[in-house]
Every structure is written in structure tokens, then in C-alpha cells.
Amino acid sequence: MIKTIIFDLGGVLLDIDLPYCIQRVKELGVDIDALSAIPAPELAIDTKPAVMGEGMVASGMLHLYQVGGISTADFIKTIQRLCRPGISYEQVLEAWNTCCIDIPQRRLDNVLALRQRGYRIYMLSNTNDAHWQDIKNRCFGGQDMVDKYFDNVFLSQEMQLAKPNDDIFLKVIEFLSVQPEECLFIDDSTANVEAASYLGFHTIHADVSTTKNGKVIALPNVDWMDEIEEILTQNATSQS
């Protein structure tokens, strides 16, 4: 019986615009290929590239930041060194955070409604400290509001692992003391959904993006509740 529902953040709850973020960073004079090519030091952390969004992965220094291997200050300063002269730390940080748009309230209302029905609700996200601080404070209004919606939050930067690495899913279910078949996982990445499904999770691929002015963004009026309710109903029926 499904008792636990695990949501991805970006592209599922949070509307994101990675192409716009890349554009803004380029406007600072950064060669994106050069940034992506910066190698990461050898550390005892996950080395499998993290999925940032459908079709986009973080490698090298970008991946290192996603899994908490480098501080925000060091990461932003690394980008700043690639900018044209005169670009400030604050300008780089602002450009980096432009991929995080907003979380429509209806999605949060639905998350809360599921929690009030007795489901344990969690977030599992490939994210970094700068993005999480921005999202937590601007979209949620602080940690207390995050706690209102979720029983716990699992972040790649804190776990030093990233989806689709099997180990991050295994660590989550070990921490929660649940079996994969008791969990429903919702993510916008094919690779992440396939990894979870292979381990036995019930899954939903939240693949409802659209292109607007050359940018791929999640539709703000979509919340995947029909798909969630269908799987929950089917699962309950099969267990009765």
C-alpha cells in the first residue's frame, strides 16, 4: 500500500527556466562550455552527473556544487572569474538564481491536502545551496512553511548524492524505513523516473513542459493530481 509520496522540486512543484538562466549567465560574459568544463576535485562524493532538468545534466564543478562539494561563495566566485571585468558577486548570484521562477499555490495546496489525508510527504531534489535558499525564503516564506508541507526534505547538496544515482533513493527509503513499493515518486526527468521505477517505486513522469519564446517552462496550471489520484486508487484497490 502506498503510504509515502515523494515529490521532485524543479519542474514538478517549482516552475523553472534553465535556458533563461543560461542566457543571463552568458550576458555576464561567461562561456558556458568553459564553465561546464571546469573539473571537480577528487572528493568522496557522488561522481555520477546530476540531472538538473530533462535533457540537462550538471558535470564537473556544476555537479560538485549540486552535491555539496563546494560552498556557494566559492562556486559564485568561480563563475565571477569567467565574467567580463566589473561584474559583481551579487550580479552573478542573481543571474544564477533566475532559473527558479515560482511555486503555484495550488500545487502547495494539493501537497498539503495529501498530507492531511495521512500520506507522508517528502521532497527529493537535485539542488544547490543558492537555489534552495532562494526557493525556501521567496517561494515558501522560510523553513517553518517548508515544514508545513513536508515531513522531510532530501537535498542532493546535503546528501552528497544526486538523482539518478540509485544510492540516493536507497538512502531515502532506509532513512524512512519504507519499501520502494510503498512509495510514489514524481519527477520531471526520464532518467530519475526510470531509476526509481527500476528499484520498485511507483512513479509518475511529470512531462508537461511547453516552449514559450524559445524557453522550456513548466505549465503553471498543471499539478499532476489526476495522475496521483489514479495511482493511489489503483494501488488501494489492488491491496483490498
PLM feature spans:
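Substrate-recognition element of Asp-dependent hydrolases with the DxDx(T/V) motif
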Residues: 89-139
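A metal-dependent, Asp-based hydrolase signature
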Residues: 50-93
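Active-site neighborhood of HAD-like aspartate-dependent phosphohydrolases
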Residues: 1-52, 198-199, 209
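Helix N-cap/coil-helix junction residues
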Residues: 30, 85, 177-178
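Short amphipathic alpha-helical segments and helix-helix/interface helices
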Residues: 22, 108-112, 123, 169, ...
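Helical cap/lid subdomains and adjacent loops of hydrolase enzymes that gate the active-site channel
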Residues: 24-25, 38-40, 45, 60-64, ...
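Asp-based, Mg2+/Mn2+-dependent phosphohydrolase catalytic module
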Residues: 1-7, 128-129, 134-240
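Generic structural signal for small/hydrophobic residues in well-ordered secondary structure
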Residues: 8-11, 68, 114, 123, ...
